[in-house]
Amino acid sequence: MKILNLGSLNIDKVYAVGHFAAAGETIKAERLDLFPGGKGLNQSIAAARAGAEVYHAGAVGRDGGGLSELLRGSGVNVGLLRQLDGESGHAVIQVTPSGQNCIIVFPGTNGMITHGYIDSVLKNFAKGDVLLLQNEISCVDYAMEKGSEMGMRVVVNPSPVTDALLNCPLGLADCFILNETEGMALAGTGSSANADILRALAKRFPAADIVLTVGKDGALYSGRDGTFLSHGIYDTDVKDTTAAGDTFCGYYIACTAAGESPREALEKASAASSIAVSRKGASPSIPEMREVMSFLERNDG
């Protein structure tokens, strides 16, 4: 089973700060690091490092050669990637000493995806393959519709949540992987209680599996068959949470695509995410499957 990630590619500019800058405030950064990033890139790398056959489709500018090389070096097929005139997407990220982050994203070439390009990409895939989508590229709604028409398994990581995303045909999704903030926005519930968010999402999207990541409380799962699962987090020294969600997402998708149960996928995705937050950077923090298995042997054995 192939995984097609039609997703973003960014250059991350990460500033180490004592606290997030407030409105009207100027603060000094202690350090600047440049990393390849974007939810799309991170999730493709995570899925590939989990052992999946991953194809990344999307666009970079003339400054994005390093992004495609990183994907290729991580085992991701980049034959469908396009280089366009203009700047690649980039993100400005503030990271505090506790590892929390605040992110501003400029779409760049991520916003230049067209219907014609999506059609040319999808002809390389078939019914049963996985289509992974975030909300950092243009024409997400069209990709959902076409992927669903083909019988692909449409997995949506609805980030960031925007009015345009909420107007997408989200009912076509076969699986959602999202955090509490995204869950509240999609569910339309005023409650911040995890159980209420999960219940509201399951009611609104009865044909989809729901995976809700809930920070220090781990992750919750509600299957379309009525199955409910939960998995806690592992105790690690948190250094940077930037790629935590993307690592979880990529690992979960890879494991389920390989035929593993949701319970097994939650376990490995949670372990991979725990390893990622103990390291600096986004894509550099994503572990290989052998590291995840070794981690689980130490923590679950």
Regions found by a protein language model. Give the residues of each.
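Residues at secondary-structure transition points
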Residues: 27, 31-38, 42, 86-87, ...
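Positively charged, low-complexity intrinsically disordered leader regions
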Residues: 1-23
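Substrate-binding N-lobe of the ribokinase-like
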Residues: 3, 23-90, 290, 294-300
